[in-house]
Amino acid sequence: MSDEIVTNKSVTYVNNTTPVTITSSELDLRSCYQDDEVVIEVHAAALNPIDFITHQLCNSYIFGKYPKTYSRDYSGVIIKAGKDVDNRWKVGDKVNGMYSHIYGERGTLTHYLILNPAKDVPITHMVEVPKDENDPYDDFVYAAAWPLTFGTAFSTLYDFKKDWTSDSKVLVIGASTSVSYAFVHIAKNYFNIGTVVGICSKNSIERNKKLGYDYLVPYDEGSIVENVKKLKQSVLENDKFDMIFDSVGNHDFFPVIDQFLKPKAKNSFYVTIAGNNKADYKNISWRDFVSLSSILKAINPFKKYNWRFGHPYPPNNFIEVGNEMIKKGTYKPPIDSVYEFDQYKEAIDRLMSNRAKGKVVVKMK
């Protein structure tokens, strides 16, 4: 077999009745790409909840019977480039990004990813992550770990509210998630938001103190609402929040939202990326994300506050912001665990366990 003909292995599924498996196909590197495309040899890909959520919601009658590939985040090296590709992208370049798809035959949990760098954005050149001598992970692992979560957090802060100041206050429900990790770093180091309050378990408070939260409230020691109310009254001068950001799925504050969120006229927002209830990743249904209450909150013209479902696919400019913050050392992608390609099932199980503190990454090389 010619060196230009390779076996491309990918982690795929067909629908919600079929398991995740490794499928193989023959790829001719001389002809598998168009003139405006590049071929990336993937070194690492990160898992995100959207991967197994879309898998479990994939009805064969609606979404077809073709193999669908896992994952969106990636890092790797360009090994082929079409003649019409912008010369910014050259063979040998180390790149990372987010390949956006829902039920695509192409995904990033694969050995070779073919994409159009002018259309399949965001894509960027990898930057070196500041590391100490005991750091166990290489730059490819870190580069794959941040695009989707960082971009989701950035778009939440950038899209909905433009007038952040040192007097602004934000409440984060689910302070320990990877999106919230990015959120607090962006809020404090890029938008210079004055006060960020996080809600997490009592066992996670010490860890999260180091991330930049100004105050932390445990959800497993009494009422969340009452604990936040006490904090607001005792140290925030009873001032309300400019934004409540929910990254886990919660509805506790809705009955008393006017006590915590500033009036709608002041451009305040309640933003969720997880719906109104914490999802059971092993038993997901459309109702977890498209509930009647969510629809009513979105379209009700009489509600007294701005409610939005956060963007799963963020604006392209976030990738450069992330690069700059990484180079400055103001954001370092959090890694929970790293698995080899043939350990993909263990990697998925780890993320589905809800115990991961940081990103779960799969290495191809």
Curated annotation (Swiss-Prot):
Keywords: Lipid droplet, Mitochondrion. This is Protein YIM1. One of its GO terms (biological process) is DNA damage response. Present with 6540 molecules/cell in log phase SD medium. Belongs to the YIM1 family. Pfam families: ADH_N, ADH_zinc_N_2. It is found in: Lipid droplet; Mitochondrion. GO terms for cellular component: cytoplasm; endoplasmic reticulum; lipid droplet; mitochondrion. It comes from the Eukaryota. Its main location: other. GO terms for molecular function: alcohol dehydrogenase [NAD(P)+] activity. It comes from Saccharomyces cerevisiae (strain ATCC 204508 / S288c). Disruption phenotype: Displays sensitivity to DNA damaging agents.
